[in-house]
Each structure stands twice: as C-alpha cells, then as structure tokens.
Amino acid sequence: GSMQLINDERSAEIYDVVKSLSPSMVSGGSASNTINGLANLGINTGMVGMIGENELGNFFLQDMKNSGVEPHFFTSQSRTGSCISLIRPDSERTLATCLGAAIELTADNINEELFDGYDYFYVEGYLVQNAELIETALRIAHEKGLKTCLDLASYNVVEDNLDFLKTLIRKYVDVVFANEEEATAFTGKEDIEALNEIGELADIVIIKLGCKGSIVKWGESIT
C-alpha cells in the first residue's frame, strides 16, 4: 500500500463508501504514533502541529493530553487533517490523507523555544510537502543540539522528493527510519546494501522489516 493525498470532497466520498464497515476513530499519523508510544513508556514528549477548531481537532488535542504528550498546537479555521486507512488482511495499508489544517503550519510558526527541554526531534517524511517548514524545523533542532530523526514515510514520497530528502539528511539528520520499500526507493538497492548507502548520510539508520524486526547501522556496527 501507499499514501495518496486527497481533498475534503474526495475524503467525504471515500468515507461514504467505507462507513458501512463501522470504522473507528483514533489519533494517528507517523509522528503522533511515535510520540504516543514514547509517552506510554514514560518519556517526556511534546508535539508541534496545526489543528482545526472542530470535533476532530478537539478529539486529537484531548487524546494527546491523555497520553501525556505536551501539545504545542496552533489552530486554524480549516478542518483538522484526517486520514482514511484501508487495511488488508495481510496488514498492507492504503492511506487516503486529507491534510486540512495540518498543511497550514508554516516555517513562521517554528521558533527556538519550541525545542527547549527536549533532546530529540522526530519528523515524518510526509512533511516534505512543505519544504520550507521541514527544512526550517530540522535546521533549528540541529542548531540547538537535538538529535534529529526522520522517517521516510512512504516509498512514493521518497520517489517524488529524492534529491531534497538526500540534501536534508546530509545537512541536518542524525537518525533515519525506513521500511524496505522506502529504503529501496531511496537507494535503488536492498537490505544491507541499502542500509550502508543511507548510512553514508546519517549516523544511525534503521530499516524496518515488519514481523522480521529491523536491521540497524550505527557507525560501523550492523545489527
């Protein structure tokens, strides 16, 4: 599966088709899921984002607070971003994403104070849709001495933004996360060869292998 960006109208059309399947509503997104997981381990976490002043926005805000995540959220008159996730029995998923208010977060919203008190900065590759925003955030985090982490998000995101992603990683990123498809899209290679090539740009590289675990390169060490 992959991720496709859609508008409000298309999102409503898809929801009309799938609502008979009794879908559930949960907070999600690559960064949100990661931060939630860390918060559940008792780690001090925060999240920066833009939400709408609507039911979805309130749900997301309260869910983050309930999980122990400190929200650094800006608000918009637009609808809160949402994603319809279609999951097959083999766990492959297709994501129909309407960015909504999320895409209105800009580089002007990012300041040094947002990073105070944190040691790591994690950003999802989907944010390359706003090149100025992702580069500004990574640059400031890097300059303030945080360890910066980037998840490549989806193979089609990698294919469409390959040169820009390589530049970002080379200049600002310490840790790269990718699954097998994303690593191959990034390098044209597989497994250890892909791991080593990405490792030329970042200090730590993690390639996720689903039920088989992960392979990790840290300096010269591979596990």
Residue spans of the language-model regions?
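A glycine-rich beta-to-alpha transition motif near the start of alpha/beta enzyme domains, typified by
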Residues: N7, Y15, K19, T45-P71
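Ribokinase/PfkB-type carbohydrate-kinase core domain
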Residues: G1-M3, P23-V26, M50, L61-S76, ...
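Glycine-rich phosphate/adenosyl-contacting loop at the front of the ribokinase-like
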Residues: G1-G46
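Conserved beta-strand residues within beta-sheet cores
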Residues: N44, G81-C83
